[in-house]
C-alpha cells in the first residue's frame, strides 16, 4: 500500500486555518491526505461580531475561548479534518491580543516557555511525521504577536524534530512552507468584487490596510482550489460566526472591522526548507507535495 501524504498546518487562533489555508486543507483532505491542524490558543481576545454572543467577550463573561472550540470543530469538519488539536492542550496558552492588550489571568502565548511550546509541537511532528509543515512568515502575516510567535515556535520545532533534543524518534520534515498573501492575486480579487458581494456597512479594503503581501517573484507555491475546496472554505469561514461574516454571494467575507475580504480560491506559499518540485511558467509549484516520493507505507 502506498504511503499516505501527511501535512501539518500550525495556526495561532481558531479561524486562521480557514482564512489563510482553508482551500488548501480541503484540497488535500479530499485527495485522501492525512491533514492535521494545530491551533496555539483559544482566541479569547477576539472581537465578537453581532449581539447574539456579545456577552461572551473578554470584557464581559470572558467565555469566548471555550465557545470558539465549537466553531473550530465545525470549521475543521467542513474542511475534512478531525477534532481540533491545541498546542499544549486546549487553554494551555491564552490569546495574547494585539499590542497593548492587558495581561489576563492565564499565561499568554507570547510569554510561553519556548522549550515547552517547541517541545509540544515537536511531539506532534514526531507522532504524525508530516511530509509538509505550514506555518507563518517572520512578520506573522499581518503582525499579530501570536502569529509572530507561531513563526518562532514552528521554525524551532521543525528544526528540533529532526534532532535529538526532545523525546521520541526524530523526524526530518521534508518541506516547510510559510503561508503568505500574494499581492497581485489579492488585488485582482478585490477589484473583481461588486456591490452584490458586500453586506450593508462593509467597506472595500485600501492599499494601506494590506501592506504585508508578497510579490510574485517571492512566491514559491500556489494551491488552486477546485469548486469543492472553495465551497468548503466558505463553509468553514461561516462556521466561525463570532469572528467572520460571509457575504451574500460567498465571494467575500468580513471580520469585525467590516472590511470586505475576497474569499480566495488560490492560496500562496513560500518554501523555506526542503527541495522544490516541478514549477510552472511563473516559477511556482502547484502542489505542496511536489518533488516528494511516496513508496510503501512505513511500519511504525
UniProtKB/Swiss-Prot annotation:
Binds 1 zinc ion per subunit. InterPro entries: GlcNAc_PI_deacetylase-related (IPR003737), LmbE-like_dom_sf (IPR024078), Mycothiol_biosynthesis_MshB (IPR017810). Disulfide bonds: none annotated. Its cofactor is Zn(2+). This is 1D-myo-inositol 2-acetamido-2-deoxy-alpha-D-glucopyranoside deacetylase. GO terms for biological process: mycothiol biosynthetic process. The gene is mshB. It comes from the Bacteria. Keywords: Hydrolase, Metal-binding, Zinc. Its EC number is 3.5.1.103. It comes from Mycolicibacterium paratuberculosis (strain ATCC BAA-968 / K-10). Zn(2+) binds at residues 13, 16, 147. SUPFAM superfamilies: LmbE-like. GO terms for molecular function: N-acetylglucosaminylinositol deacetylase activity; zinc ion binding. It catalyses: 1D-myo-inositol 2-acetamido-2-deoxy-alpha-D-glucopyranoside + H2O = 1D-myo-inositol 2-amino-2-deoxy-alpha-D-glucopyranoside + acetate. Pfam families: PIG-L. Belongs to the MshB deacetylase family. Catalyzes the deacetylation of 1D-myo-inositol 2-acetamido-2-deoxy-alpha-D-glucopyranoside (GlcNAc-Ins) in the mycothiol biosynthesis pathway.
